[in-house]
Amino acid sequence: MATKDTGGGQQKATRSTEEVEEQAQDAQASEDLKERQEKLSDDVDSVLDEIDDVLEENAEDFVRSFVQKGGE
């Protein structure tokens, strides 16, 4: 019986180690996702700023391109 208790204790230690490793991997994955989200957010903001600049310069042309002409 003493052998089984020791084996169970070692198994518990292994499970704890595995749980710690999983938590570390989850934390790293979470950080990677945050970095990726920030980069994508910056990219989207950059594109939107560029669109705003173009619209400010060419607003009239932009609107005309969407106005239907007779029969279209």
UniProtKB/Swiss-Prot annotation:
One of its GO terms (biological process) is protein pupylation. Residues 1-10 have a biased composition (Gly residues). Residues 10-60 form a coiled coil. Keywords: Coiled coil, Isopeptide bond, Ubl conjugation pathway. Pathway: Protein degradation; proteasomal Pup-dependent pathway. Residues 28-66 are annotated as: ARC ATPase binding. Residues 1-45 are annotated as: Disordered. The keyword Lipid metabolism does not apply. Residues 31-42 have a biased composition (Basic and acidic residues). There is a cross-link at residue 72 (Isoglutamyl lysine isopeptide (Glu-Lys) (interchain with K-? in acceptor proteins)). Belongs to the prokaryotic ubiquitin-like protein family. HAMAP family: Pup. NCBIfam families: pupylate_cterm. Strongly interacts with the proteasome-associated ATPase ARC through a hydrophobic interface; the interacting region of Pup lies in its C-terminal half. There is one Pup binding site per ARC hexamer ring. Protein modifier that is covalently attached to lysine residues of substrate proteins, thereby targeting them for proteasomal degradation. The tagging system is termed pupylation. The N-terminal unstructured half of Pup provides a signal required to initiate unfolding and degradation by the proteasome but is not needed for pupylation, while the C-terminal helical half of Pup interacts with ARC to target proteins to the proteasome. This is Prokaryotic ubiquitin-like protein Pup.
